[in-house]
UniProtKB/Swiss-Prot annotation:
Known cofactor(s): Mg(2+)
Organism taxonomic ancestry: Bacteria, Pseudomonadati, Bacteroidota, Flavobacteriia, Flavobacteriales
Gene Ontology MF terms: 3'-5'-RNA exonuclease activity; magnesium ion binding; polyribonucleotide nucleotidyltransferase activity; RNA binding
SUPFAM superfamilies named in the record: Eukaryotic type KH-domain (KH-domain type I), Nucleic acid-binding proteins, Ribonuclease PH domain 2-like, Ribosomal protein S5 domain 2-like
The protein's name in its UniProt record: Polyribonucleotide nucleotidyltransferase
Cell location: Cytoplasm
Principal subcellular localization: cytoplasm
Positions of the S1 motif domain: 630-701
Residues holding Mg(2+): 491, 497
Keywords for the protein's UniProt record, in alphabetical order: Cytoplasm, Magnesium, Metal-binding, Nucleotidyltransferase, RNA-binding, Transferase
Length: 714
């Protein structure tokens, strides 16, 4: 059977085009497409259950993105030679797509839904993560799954002042903006990226530019759907509703929730008070009513949440009072401390309200760099950040199941916020670890602040300190309130989570998630302006604690010295089977790493003992010392022989040469000891390699004038 293939082409306007094709692959999925740009091909599939599982009151959506090694003509690493758990880059792409899709499904759609995106063919000039959102939305578009508000995602960069959509990796290296934008036709839903200290106006310009490109891609999806014979969305059983129950719960709970929202209480106290009101709402109904109506308990819980959310939002909109009593632009109290942990290379504590992060910095050689090996990217990171969010940080006891997607995403955001402030000539590999010890909103921004101070405490010469803030939004369509430094509850009950990091001079990273349709750009501009004021306030608190990086690393932290040697000396420094370098490391207590770069050997010496480092440098100097013919060098006698003296260059201890008896003096020398003695230091002239003996020659007499010859007596 010949497949019925439908296709749409998207012209990118720069000689490139994206094709979206359906009808050839994975036809048993509810929807499947192949998206292609150059030789990069992504297969995206969408499948959703026909019914919801009982008791499920949320959308169980799974977005999975994988890059197949075969796509790049490579074998997977490891013993089993098979793709295993997703890499961090794959997890980050999953999150980018999920965050745009999830809020645009119908609120009452609770069927198990799975969107899978696979890189099937790789192109070195195409970054596949920028096509994943388009592929996912297109797979939903050609299905009967009720996803009415199509989306797409693009990467926007600015290269030499010009904005570019979906640049290549090579082009991106020259860019000062790297942002992923996800949007529907009407509004931007997601922003994430890093920048090199750009202004708020420049960021808005880039978002608008990307949104126009996204609209073109959404129109292409609509055209593709229109070509299909079946364009009907499936019917589904939505949530059970009962207006009478809602009215009863709201009448009993709204005023109480409204009052609690104005009391400026702490997280735990406020939670207990809301829980009491919820129990009172449950008690409005008898045991017989619960027994007769299996849905009643779930309805009461749902309607209480709805009532509570409405009350809290209205207090903010009507009175400008937040749950903890702050004004909309007010930042929570901040206290900071550096050098908290005595044995680590750098540490800091950052506490803002009920959110606390403890950051540590570890310094190492290039051997400790984070290796990246995926079908679409190979390389290493010399600066990386890990974010840990244990359950006790929110007062909970939960199973520990390894690093979560959320931890990967938050760590990546904080890493991108700081990375461009690490000097390009920093010789260290740097690992920052953030332990979130308390959390009540914007722990990732606390990580940025703690990370900045820990880096400065470690003696890393940051270009500029970085701070971060999370902004929120409450709107009813007419009135709106932009909230600075949001609480966890304000994140859950609000319409936006907008994290912004930067220096005093510009934005370094951002992450925005919009939960409503049609966010106006003027609101976004106000949020960015308000975020800047908040960032600068927080930055002032950081610099009050530590005004500048330490002049040097701490005494117990390793110091690193880098020395470049000719490539042909690498083998001599390593020695047979690594003997020379291993003995040198053991004797000096150092770590020595050698990398070959452009036919040169880049030697990194890491150690806590300055004398040990000096010994290694002296050994390198000795091994690589190469005297020039005709030049004079200072030497020291280390051995006396009948036919001369063995001397070593004082500039390269261990580098020895024979000073032959015939080169000691112009006069005939019967006894070497008559001219030089053990330990004598003097200069010799380097004569080069003797063509007969193939050994190096030096001369002491060549540096003194030759005495005139005496005429023979007749």
């Amino acid at each position: 059977m010949i497949p019925q293939v439908s296709q749409e082409i998207i012209d990118l306007g720069d000689g490139r085009s994206i094709s979206i094709e359906t009808g050839k692959l994975a036809k048993q999925a509810d929807g499947s497409v192949v998206v292609r740009l150059g030789n990069c091909m992504l297969l995206a599939t969408a499948v959703s259950a026909r019914t919801s599982n009982p008791g499920v009151d949320f959308l169980p959506l799974t977005v999975d993105y994988r890059e197949k090694f075969a796509a790049a003509g490579r074998f997977p690493g490891g013993f089993f030679k098979r793709e295993a758990r997703p890499s961090d880059s794959e997890v980050l792409t999953m999150r980018l797509v999920d965050r745009v899709l999830r809020p645009l499904f119908p609120d009452d759609y609770h069927a198990e839904t799975q969107v899978m995106i696979q890189l099937m063919s790789h192109d070195d000039n195409v970054m596949p993560d920028a096509l994943a959102g388009l592929a996912a939305s297109a797979a939903l578009a050609v299905s009967d799954i009720p996803f009415y508000n199509l989306i797409s995602e693009v990467r926007v960069a600015r290269i030499d002042g010009k904005l570019v959509i979906n640049p290549s990796r090579t082009e991106l290296e020259k860019s000062d903006i790297d942002m992923m934008i996800g949007a529907s036709l009407d509004s931007v839903a997601m922003v994430e990226g890093e920048m090199k200290e750009i202004s708020e106006a420049e960021m808005i310009e880039a978002i608008k530019f990307a949104h126009e490109a996204i609209k073109v891609q959404i129109h292409a999806q609509q055209k593709l759907r229109a070509k299909l014979s079946s364009q009907e969305y499936r019917t589904y059983e939505g949530e059970v509703e009962d207006e009478a129950v809602y009215a009863k719960v709201k009448a009993a709970a709204y005023d109480k929730c409204y009052a609690i929202a104005q009391e400026a209480s702490g997280k735990a106290e406020r939670g207990e008070k809301f829980a009491t009101v919820k129990e009172e709402a449950k008690a409005l109904f008898t045991e017989e009513e619960y027994a007769e109506n299996a849905d009643l308990a779930g309805l009461v819980g749902k309607y209480f949440y709805k009532t509570n959310k409405e009350a809290v939002r209205n207090v903010i909109l009507e009175k400008g009072i937040r749950l903890d009593g702050r004004k909309t632009t007010e930042i929570r109290p901040i206290w900071c401390e550096t050098d908290y942990l005595p044995s680590v290379h750098g540490s800091s504590l950052f506490t803002r309200g009920e959110t606390q992060a403890l950051a540590t910095v570890t310094l190492g050689t290039s051997r400790e760099a984070n290796q990246i090996d995926s079908p679409s990217e190979q390389g290493e990171e010399k600066f990386y950040l890990h974010y840990n969010f244990p359950p006790f940080s929110t007062g909970e006891a939960k199973p520990l199941r390894g690093t979560s997607r959320r931890e990967v995403g938050h760590g990546n955001l904080a890493q991108r916020a700081l990375k461009n402030m690490i000097p390009a000539d920093c010789p260290y590999t740097i690992r920052v670890v953030s332990e979130v010890l308390e959390s009540n909103g914007s722990s990732s921004m606390a990580t940025v602040c703690a990370g900045t101070m820990a880096l400065m405490d470690a003696g890393v010469q940051m270009v500029k300190p970085v701070s971060g803030i999370a902004m929120g939004l409450i709107t009813d369509g007419e009135k709106f309130a932009v909230l600075s430094d949001i609480l966890g509850d304000e994140d859950h009950l609000g319409d936006m989570d907008f994290k912004v990091t930067g220096t005093a001079d510009g934005i370094t990273a951002c992450q925005m998630d919009i939960k409503i349709d049609g966010l106006r750009y003027d609101i976004m501009e106000q949020a960015l302006a308000q975020a800047r004021d908040g960032r600068l306030h927080i930055l002032g608190k950081l610099t009050e604690t530590i005004a500048a990086p330490r002049a040097d690393v701490k005494a117990h932290a390793p110091k690193i010295i880098t020395r470049t040697i000719p490539g042909n000396f690498i083998g001599a420094l390593i020695g047979p089977g690594g003997k020379v370098i291993q003995e040198l490391q053991k004797a000096t207590g150092t770590t020595i790493v050698i990398n070959e770069v452009d036919e040169q050997g880049v030697v990194e010496i890491l150690g806590t003992d300055p004398e040990g480092i000096k010994t290694v440098l002296a050994k390198i100097d000795a091994l690589t010392f190469k005297p020039q013919v005709g030049e004079a060098y200072e030497v020291k006698v280390i051995k006396m022989l009948d036919f001369g003296a063995v001397v070593e260059y004082t500039a390269a201890p261990g580098n020895e040469v024979l000073l032959h008896v015939s080169e000691l003096a112009w006069e005939r020398t019967e006894n070497v000891a008559d001219v030089v003695k053990m330990g004598d230091v003097f200069e010799v002239k380097y004569l080069g390699v003797d063509p007969k003996t193939k050994k190096e020659k030096v001369s002491k007499k060549a540096l003194v004038p030759r005495p005139p010859r005496e005429d023979k007596k007749e």
